[in-house]
Amino acid sequence: MAIFSVYVVNKAGGLIYQWDSYSPRAEAEKTFSYPLDLLLKLHDERVLVAFGQRDGIRVGHAVLAINGMDVNGKYTADGKEVLEYPGNSANYPVSIRFGRPRLTSNEKLMLASMFHSLFAIGSQLSPEQGSSGIEMLETDTFKLHCFQTLTGIKFVVLADPRQAGIDSLLRKIYEIYSDFALKNPFYSLEMPIRCELFDQNLKLALEVAEKAGTFGPGS
């Protein structure tokens, strides 16, 4: 069971809060000898696996770290180009960690705006008057759950398909937003949420939900 991401989108479609959990289960690390038996390529400023799927490493996975050093896009933390490593035998043996490409801040903003538009389209296309819009989208690897308040704020949770009690969790997040963001005298409505107590209570609620597998009343 796992909760992958939490997004809060304002009524204009702007992303005002996001939290991500990068699960080690979705990552694979392996030590390679020369020559590297994977084909890596640069795509959208990320180094991805193009060929050589094996041992939990999938085509489309991104290089996340080399020899324990985090990779940011196409560069390591010390400024070296990732694609320079495979062709130099002096760099071997080399330990590489792979995983799903992580979204950039701009991509998250774009996806929030896109979901806001799809939500509105879904509401308009519904044959029922007063449609609530998109409440859940399901894939083979995750479910997207959405709860929209009367004021148009959307709370979105991406979770493992087997995770139970997400509807209750969404309403708990709304309570936390009301208590620790809206009641904060320094918070401006519709603006990005930067409140320490909101962060702390949200993380606590997510931990409880993950451990229990459900999030019932009174939690």
From Swiss-Prot:
Where is this protein localized, as stated in its record? Postsynaptic cell membrane; Golgi apparatus membrane; Endoplasmic reticulum; Vesicle
- Output a single Gene Ontology CC term carried by this record: Golgi membrane
UniProt entry keywords in alphabetical sequence: Cell membrane, Endoplasmic reticulum, ER-Golgi transport, Golgi apparatus, Membrane, Postsynaptic cell membrane, Synapse, Transport
Q: Name one Pfam family in it.
A: Sybindin
Q: Which SUPFAM superfamilies match?
A: SNARE-like
Sorted alphabetically, which InterPro entries does this protein's record hold? Answer: Longin-like_dom_sf (IPR011012), TRAPPC (IPR007233)
Task: Tell me a GO biological process for this protein.
Answer: endoplasmic reticulum to Golgi vesicle-mediated transport
Family, according to the entry, reads as follows: Belongs to the TRAPP small subunits family. TRAPPC4 subfamily.
Q: How does it assemble?
A: Component of the multisubunit TRAPP (transport protein particle) complex, which includes at least TRAPPC2, TRAPPC2L, TRAPPC3, TRAPPC3L, TRAPPC4, TRAPPC5, TRAPPC8, TRAPPC9, TRAPPC10, TRAPPC11 and TRAPPC12. Interacts with SDC2.
The protein's job, in short, is: Core component of the TRAPP complexes which has a function of guanine nucleotide exchange factor activity for Rab1 GTPase. Plays a role in vesicular transport from endoplasmic reticulum to Golgi and autophagy. May play a role in dendrite postsynaptic membrane trafficking.
**What is the recorded name of this protein?**
Trafficking protein particle complex subunit 4
The organism named in the record is: Rattus norvegicus
